[in-house]
């Protein structure tokens, strides 16, 4: 038994000492060959020594057990508390002293006689010994405890951001979020928090020091490769991969008996060899689970345990192979295991949203190990804007370079002259498909749609344009150009002017109009813009479009097969079906469920996903001048379901518009925006054939043609009674009857197909040719078809067969342009005749091309002139992107297979021929889809040298894939249609059109190269591919030497693991007294290299020792923890509070910006990660605690202030307004902080809350109690103006903007405002002098010279000064009296200050004069001519009466006057009674 000597740093009485610990290592073969230790002079020479290896039999087991036990007892008997050194000398172990091999070998002796076969069960002693070694090591490790971790724990407990939870320590950032993969240095100590966020001890003592010789591998002799030739391996270009199989020398037949292998006996390389111990451990655990072995190994398991476990698994595998008699199951199992390893899956490819398939790789042009894949080209991003490699200064509408190179799959190198010639060859094939395939020119395509223009070399546009001119003569006249009208899918705003400058050989989309339709009509109400963009935001300003020929030709649309369809489906899937979906990687089941939601939503009034107002968009598209409309199949028929099987709710409206276009749509165009009622509408008029302007009178046809479209995008639209919508139909249409073609109703859109159907709805123009509509005609609607308003009107009296379309001219074109946007081009209609999501046919009759052929009459009735076919290519089914899932034709591996080898989604090649011929029979031109950007996974693989890049081809920082070998699906079969037709027409094309091959292409400066016919695609013709999920380490290499395993016949590069060659070696970490060294699983010592154990990485220097701490390696900065573990994708917080970030490859990011995920960036300066407010190139930017840059968001910075950072640049906004997500506005001052309180900005007096939000439409009370109001629109402080609050109360704000209080004279009115600023209306007010005023209930004006009755029915009178009068008053000839509180006296007695009593009438309130009055007690008074109650003896109306001093008349009483005379007054009449 070997003594395994392991050295450790131990702390003993505060001193570090080196301790060597011996542990048992089982040796399962003889040492006669000696142990060869790789040193600095180690050679890669590999010689098999299997002839020197003897076999251990089961009979020797007892000797081994005794020896192992005694050695273990000796090792464990050392005194625990002392430092002991055990001799490092090693004696040669007799084979009988070694743990026996549990299996025997069945082989043929030299004399031909078969050896005795022996079979045993798995040797439990071996496993027990391995387990004991692990236990012994653990016990030895605890002899002396390193107290450095204890010191770390003391520091952790003092850190305010660290919390202990369930015995573990976590670091929380200032937002309360647990930091993961985070390291900080505090008090000189390195504290590391792992991927879970928990603190992890990374002291030197945690290094795995388990080193084993490969002689302990039970089956090494038998598992060695049969020979080193390529025939003994499954390989790719002579390189081994994680899924490579090989032929071993022996097979453990039935899991029991070793037998020599045959040429059919291949086994997975991963059954025998693994790149690291960690990979082996995971393999063992994975296979145990697959094979029903109930045992799991963790990262404390030693190498010997894993070897024994792997041997057990191998025996199980072989037994199962014998039982099943095949290895198919094993291939599936191994492949599944491979996909679990980060080095062999997308985890190590660093996928994120920088590409439609999550990432791309670029092939190196000078790969030394893959010269067959090199290229002199791969010139990237040569878009129309950037064709020369520099941004063309002529084109400024798009300030980017107008696109990017890597779109999808195998990215074709369209800068390669050989490839360019092949693209021309393919284009010629498409344009002559009928002739070539069916010997029928009537089945040829007439034109092309160029796919993904902004992702290919723009040289292709010249190549295609030159071909169309040479072969089809499109530059000669309009008829030739229109007969071969080709279009581009080019999204950059620079592409159309570029195309125009290139001669308008093809036309591009009017993307501005598409966006206008989208945001003015199709979006939800709260996202809609105004309607004016529909008039002006386009390639054509349609305010008054009266030109014979537009400046630039174009086509227009609102939706397409891949625009506003698959993105909506994606949104549905992500929101309601699978929130974890990435990009466009859907399953068919997810798509099916999404369409159930999509189709239901289409029928809803309040839509969540689908477009609003589709019919309104088409009403403009199909009546607009100066652009060719393209109708999308999915707007007339459901996107899913069988072809043309199910109509949408918009079908009738669109069909009606298509048919009406033939009869009516012609002449000049005028559009207007009118503000009416509470919203706006737009009108669009076509004047009719022969009339370009409103003043043109035209002819008879003019009068019966033309159209008016009226649209609104507000469902709450209401016109005022006085509003008039005036639509000027033009001078040709004076006093003419018009009828509706389409009108909005409560239930949707009503179509009127004839004059008779609309007879009751006829309207007439006036003598100026104006149609006038009122509130009775136009209002907003909300239903599944319309969210707003639509009305389309046409003249009455047009013949049923009227056709106002214009034929193209054959007169020679002389302006150097091919396509002209004139009346003839305006007359064309394109039909995009497919949906990405239409169902797969279940029978012949359902194939798209079969259905098309049956419906050509319908297409002709619609006026379709150009039928855009789906891409007819047989689809890839690799499922790597949506296109290959739904098999729409854009994902293909053979560009010449148009249903030739088998039916595609749309039918067979013969079906295609019939469909084209049927369309041609109706005069409809047919357009092919030319897709030169990409090709999907080919059936054959190549090893390429690749670098992980973003969509522009720029290397992705932090990726492990940097000029590494990578397996790509880049080679076609050589037996497909490409092999037949590739390059086949180049000689013919050179003979017919030599000028095509003489032109030097712009991006390369050289012509196309027709000398090579591409019969088989391979990597040299591609720029690269999407990441394939195979990982950075799929092509296997030895970590220690960084040499790839290769089985080439060239001995210079033929290289294999020592294990496969039955050579002895060491494996794992070891401490040699100076430092830690490492031997790879291939048997080589690591020097000047990184080593990975699973996801853990280390570096070993020039002397082979593991490094720790900060290191500069080849000019790059790295950081390694005390146990050698490299920081990767980790943040290090230095003791000075600064941060550093170490990427996926462990490199410290040094300077500049780096993208980490879609739209997320970090910035670095000399290795320091920017955190907080940072000045960069004079601009202030913000980075959070994780270093992520704030873009397009508000941030509360450390000073507590709110700031906003630009969505694109990340620069802090200064001195400008910004709107937040809630639609609230903030103003950012000179320092970038959101201002608060009162502010004067640009002459406006504004107010901002403490949170920075601008006050609009609200009242604000300042610290002095002053009230202000800020306008609901501008936010300006209201001054010298009235404002009414939500409760209907009014305020008036003075010249300073403060609400006035008290009595005020405003605009000649005398008003009053309470202390809270509220104007008094319909209320009484008593001022500080006690004066009472009343303010009118409507105007609020102080009442003057007027009576007012209060709520209790009491009356007041306010004098000329507006104050309530008191006391006796003569008003309007009446003598009245008002109490001290201003209340008029009515029906009451009043005694004045002189004691005079008056009475005021209960109705009029007039003072009673010359009249009797009886009070409530029945007493009578008489008031004289002055209105005072009389007293004493009075003669009234001839009666002698008497009234007391209080005015009460005496009745039935005696009275003695002042002279002592006694009188008596009658008890009834009160008259004095004479006494005789």
From Swiss-Prot:
Keywords assigned by UniProt, alphabetized: Dental caries, Glycosyltransferase, Repeat, Secreted, Signal, Transferase
Q: What is its main location?
A: secreted
Q: Give the PROSITE patterns listed for this entry.
A: CW
Location in the cell:
Secreted
Substituting residue 62 to T results in: In strain: MT4239
Q: Where is the composition biased (Polar residues)?
A: 43-81, 102-139
Q: Name one GO biological process term.
A: glucan biosynthetic process
What happens after mutating residue 1234 to P? In strain: MT4239
Q: What is the effect of changing residue 89 to F?
A: In strain: MT4251
Q: What is this protein called in UniProt? A: Glucosyltransferase-I
């Amino acid at each position: 038994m070997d003594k395994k000597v392991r050295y450790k740093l131990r702390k003993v009485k505060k001193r570090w000492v080196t301790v060597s610990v011996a542990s048992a290592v089982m040796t399962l073969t003889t040492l006669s060959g000696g142990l060869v230790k790789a040193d600095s002079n180690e050679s890669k020479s590999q010689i098999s020594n299997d002839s020197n290896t003897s076999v251990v039999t089961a009979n020797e087991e007892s000797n081994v057990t005794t020896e192992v036990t005694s050695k273990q007892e000796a090792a464990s008997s050392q005194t625990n508390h002392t430092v002991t050194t055990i001799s490092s000398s090693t004696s040669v172990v007799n084979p009988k002293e070694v743990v026996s091999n549990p299996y025997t070998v069945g082989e043929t002796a030299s004399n031909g006689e078969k050896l005795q076969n022996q079979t045993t069960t798995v040797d439990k002693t071996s496993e027990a010994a391995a387990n004991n070694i692990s236990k012994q090591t653990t016990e030895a490790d605890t002899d002396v405890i390193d107290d450095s971790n204890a010191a770390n724990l003391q520091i952790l407990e003092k850190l305010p951001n660290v919390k202990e939870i369930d015995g573990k320590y976590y670091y929380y950032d200032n937002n309360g979020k647990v930091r993961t993969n985070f390291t900080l240095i505090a008090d000189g100590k390195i504290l590391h928090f792992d991927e879970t966020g928990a603190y992890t001890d990374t002291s030197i003592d945690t290094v795995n020091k388990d080193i084993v010789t490969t002689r302990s591998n039970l089956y090494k002799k038998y598992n060695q490769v049969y020979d080193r030739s390529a025939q003994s391996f499954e390989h790719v270009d002579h390189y081994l991969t994680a899924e490579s199989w090989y032929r071993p020398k022996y097979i453990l037949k039935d899991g029991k008996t070793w037998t020599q292998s045959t040429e059919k006996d291949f086994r997975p390389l991963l059954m025998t060899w693994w790149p690291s111990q960690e990979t082996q451990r995971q393999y063992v655990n994975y296979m145990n689970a697959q094979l029903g072995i109930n045992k799991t190994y963790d990262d404390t398991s030693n190498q010997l345990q894993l070897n024994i476990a792997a041997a057990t698994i191998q025996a199980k595998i072989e037994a199962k192979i014998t039982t099943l008699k095949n290895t198919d199951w094993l291939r599936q199992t191994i492949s599944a295991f491979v996909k679990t390893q980060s080095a062999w899956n997308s985890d190590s490819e660093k996928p994120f949203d920088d590409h439609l398939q999550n990432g791309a790789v670029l092939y190196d042009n000078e790969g030394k190990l893959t010269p067959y894949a090199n290229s002199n080209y791969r010139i990237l991003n040569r878009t129309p804007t950037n064709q020369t490699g520099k941004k063309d200064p002529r084109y400024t509408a798009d300030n980017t370079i107008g696109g990017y190179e890597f779109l999808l799959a195998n990215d074709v190198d369209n800068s390669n002259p050989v490839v360019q010639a092949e693209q021309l060859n393919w284009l010629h094939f498409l344009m002559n498909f009928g002739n070539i395939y069916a010997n029928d020119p009537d089945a040829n395509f007439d034109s092309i749609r160029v796919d993904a223009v902004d992702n290919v070399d723009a040289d292709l546009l010249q190549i295609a344009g030159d071909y169309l001119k040479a072969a089809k003569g499109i530059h000669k006249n309009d008829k030739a150009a229109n007969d071969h009208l080709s279009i581009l899918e080019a999204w950059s705003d620079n592409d159309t002017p570029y195309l125009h400058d290139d001669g308008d050989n093809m036309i591009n989309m009017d993307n501005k109009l598409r966006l206008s339709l989208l945001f003015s009509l199709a979006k939800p109400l709260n996202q809609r813009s105004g309607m004016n963009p529909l008039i002006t935001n386009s390639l054509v300003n349609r305010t008054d479009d009266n030109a014979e020929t537009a400046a630039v030709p174009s086509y227009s649309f609102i939706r397409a097969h891949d625009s506003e369809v698959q993105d909506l489906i994606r949104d549905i899937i992500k929101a309601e079906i699978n929130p974890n979906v990435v990009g466009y990687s859907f399953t068919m089941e997810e798509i099916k469920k999404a369409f159930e939601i999509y189709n239901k939503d289409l029928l809803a009034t309040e839509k969540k996903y689908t477009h609003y107002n589709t019919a309104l968009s088409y009403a403009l598209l199909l009546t607009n001048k100066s652009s060719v409309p393209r109708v999308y199949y999915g707007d007339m028929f459901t996107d899913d379901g069988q072809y043309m099987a199910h109509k949408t709710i918009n079908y009738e409206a669109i069909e009606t518009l298509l048919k009406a276009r033939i009869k009516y749509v012609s002449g000049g165009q005028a559009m207007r925006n009118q503000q009416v009622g509470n919203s706006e509408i737009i009108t669009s008029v076509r004047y009719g054939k022969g009339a370009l302007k409103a003043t043109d009178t035209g002819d008879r046809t003019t009068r019966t043609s033309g159209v008016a479209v009226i649209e609104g995008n507000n469902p709450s639209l209401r016109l005022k009674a006085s509003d008039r919508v005036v639509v000027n139909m033009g001078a040709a249409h004076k006093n003419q009857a018009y009828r509706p073609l389409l009108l909005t109703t409560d239930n949707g859109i009503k179509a009127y197909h004839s004059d008779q159907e609309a007879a009751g709805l006829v309207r007439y123009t006036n003598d100026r040719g104006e149609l006038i509509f009122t509130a009775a005609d136009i209002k907003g609607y909300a239903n599944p078809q319309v969210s707003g308003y639509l009305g389309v009107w046409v003249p009455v009296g047009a013949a049923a067969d009227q056709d106002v379309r214009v034929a193209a001219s054959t007169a020679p074109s002389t302006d150097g342009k091919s396509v002209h946007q004139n009346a003839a081009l305006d007359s064309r209609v394109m039909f995009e005749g497919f949906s990405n999501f239409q169902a797969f046919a279940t029978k012949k009759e359902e194939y798209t091309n079969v259905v098309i052929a049956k419906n050509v009459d319908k297409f002709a009735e619609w006026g379709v002139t150009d039928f855009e076919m789906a891409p007819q290519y047989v689809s890839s089914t690799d499922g790597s992107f949506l296109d290959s899932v739904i098999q729409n034709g854009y994902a293909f591996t053979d560009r010449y297979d148009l249903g030739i080898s088998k039916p595609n989604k749309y039918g067979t090649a013969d079906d295609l021929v019939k469909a084209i011929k049927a369309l041609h029979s109706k005069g409809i031109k047919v357009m092919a889809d030319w897709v030169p950007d990409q090709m999907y996974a080919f059936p054959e693989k190549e090893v390429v040298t690749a670098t992980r890049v973003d969509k522009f081809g720029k290397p992705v920082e932090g990726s492990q894939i940097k000029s590494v070998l990578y397996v790509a699906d880049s080679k076609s079969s050589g037996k497909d249609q490409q092999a037949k037709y590739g390059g086949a027409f180049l000689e013919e094309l050179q003979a017919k059109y030599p000028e095509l091959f003489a032109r030097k292409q712009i991006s390369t400066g050289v012509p196309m190269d027709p000398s090579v016919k591409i019969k088989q695609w391979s990597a040299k013709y591609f720029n690269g591919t999407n990441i394939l999920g195979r990982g950075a380490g799929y092509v296997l290499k030895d970590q220690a030497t960084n040499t790839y395993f290769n089985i080439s016949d060239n001995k210079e590069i033929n290289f294999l693991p020592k294990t496969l060659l039955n050579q002895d070696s060491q494996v794992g970490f070891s401490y040699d007294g100076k430092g830690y060294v490492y031997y790879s699983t291939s048997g080589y010592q690591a020097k000047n290299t990184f080593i990975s154990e699973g996801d853990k990485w280390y570096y070993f220097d020039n002397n082979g020792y593991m490094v720790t701490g900060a290191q500069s390696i080849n000019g790059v900065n790295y950081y390694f923890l005390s146990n050698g573990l490299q920081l990767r994708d980790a943040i290090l917080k230095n003791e000075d509070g600064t941060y550093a970030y170490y990427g996926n490859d462990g490199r410290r990011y040094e300077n500049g910006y780096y993208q980490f995920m879609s739209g997320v960036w970090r910035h670095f300066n000399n290795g320091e990660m920017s955190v907080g407010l940072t000045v960069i190139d004079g601009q202030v930017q913000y980075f959070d605690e994780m270093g992520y840059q704030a873009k397009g968001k508000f941030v509360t910075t450390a000073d507590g202030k709110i700031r906003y950072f630009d969505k694109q640049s990340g620069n802090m906004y200064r001195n400008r307004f910004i709107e937040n997500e809630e639609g609230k506005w903030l103003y950012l001052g000179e320092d970038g902080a959101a201002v608060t309180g009162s502010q004067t900005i640009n002459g406006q007096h504004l107010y901002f809350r403490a949170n920075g939000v601008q006050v609009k439409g609200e009242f604000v009370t300042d610290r002095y109690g002053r009230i202000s109001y800020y306008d609901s629109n501008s936010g300006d402080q209201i001054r010298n103006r009235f404002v009414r609050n939500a409760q209907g109360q009014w305020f008036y704000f003075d010249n300073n903007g403060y609400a006035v209080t008290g009595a005020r004279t405003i605009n000649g009115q005398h008003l009053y405002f309470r202390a809270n600023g509220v104007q008094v209306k319909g209320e009484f007010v008593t001022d500080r002098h006690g004066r009472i005023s009343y303010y009118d209930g409507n105007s609020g004006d102080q009442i003057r010279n007027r009576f007012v009755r209060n709520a209790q029915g009491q009356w007041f009178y306010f004098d000329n000064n507006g104050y309530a009068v008191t006391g006796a008053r003569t008003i309007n000839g009446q003598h009245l009296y008002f109490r001290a509180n201003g209340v008029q006296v009515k029906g009451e007695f009043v005694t004045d200050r002189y004691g005079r009593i008056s009475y005021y009438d209960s109705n009029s309130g007039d003072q009673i004069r010359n009249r009797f009055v009886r009070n409530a007690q029945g007493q009578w008074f008489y008031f004289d001519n002055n209105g005072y109650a009389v007293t004493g003896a009075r003669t009234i109306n001839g009666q002698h009466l008497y009234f007391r001093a209080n005015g009460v008349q005496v009745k039935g009483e005696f009275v003695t006057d002042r002279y002592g005379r006694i009188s008596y007054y009658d008890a009834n009449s009160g008259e004095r009674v004479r006494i005789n």
